[in-house]
Amino acid sequence: MSQKQPYPPGEFQWAFLLPKYWKIWIAIMFLMLLAVLPWAIQWRLAHGLAALCWRLLKSRRKTTLRNLELCFPEWSPAEVEAQAKQVFVDMMLGVFETLNAWYCPKWFKGRHSIEGLEHITNAKAQGKGVLLLGTHSTLLDAGGYICAQYFEPDVVYRPQNNPLLDMLIYRCRATIYQHQIDHDDMRSLIRRLKDGGAIWYSPDQDFGLKQGVMAPFFGVPAATVTAHRRLLKISKAVAIPLYFYRYGDVRNPQYKVLIEPIVENMPSEDEIDDAIRVNQIIEAQLRIAPTQWMWFHRRFKTRAEGYDKIY
């Protein structure tokens, strides 16, 4: 859950030095130290933490298992459990990868590549803003950092409840993204697109039917956000799918950014058809690296009248 902060994002407040924030400062310093550890140690820590989370976070574990069971019916129960455990591993690896992107970005040198950059370059050459249709990848800001080595990305964000944590994350992300735009600030999003920005936008979570429609996601009806239609229509921007993922030996990983051609006729006159198309794009992306997505979120929590509960 997030909320608006009563001060400009990223701004330091003297109140952050009060004792109630000391635990967060200590935690941040500890995380900064983790970022300078060799990847071999980070990799082992990630596996250990993933195993611990698997045991302790029962609700997240059940949600992950249920989601994978629904979305990959071709998997056996044993495969579902194995892949669910890997989701937790990839999430922990993503934490270390994000710390590296924030505090030790040189670690990524020589480890990344991009395919399809011309789709963004051509759109911007025509004066178009670009809405990058992505996902909530477990790579987190590591993916954003890799994108920033090839073009200037903006990002949509949700403010954190804790004001100190919000400031620290905002400042770390400021080293990666050109602009960070509150997900509720439609005017700024539209303005940035009109100015020719390339905004990473992830329409892959359940925010209810006030902000979307029911559309199949891996064959399961899911509340699907439709705000991108308004953004594209008003700004005259184009929608371009973007996906990034880790591959190869996890002990010496490589990273790839995959950019696809412009989604034609988006938005169309049919809201549900657009939602279906976006979900199909996301499905295709997730099949590349199925465990590098946040399956522990309740993607199917909203059930319209007549639909059975999932969880």
What do the predicted segments below correspond to?
Residues 2-11, 47, 82-85, 124, ...:
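Non-catalytic C-terminal accessory region of glycerolipid acyltransferases
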Residues 2-131, 167-168, 172, 177:
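Membrane-anchoring hydrophobic helices of lipid-metabolizing enzymes
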Residues 29, 63, 118, 142, ...:
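Short Gly/charged-rich anion-binding patches and loops
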Residues 53, 108, 157-158, 177, ...:
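A generic structural signal for short
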Residues 56, 111-112, 135, 161, ...:
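Residues that cap or flank secondary-structure elements
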Residues 62, 159-163, 221-225:
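Active-site metal-coordination segments of metallo-dependent hydrolases
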Residues 126-184, 209-212:
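Catalytic core of membrane glycerolipid acyltransferases/transacylases, capturing the structured
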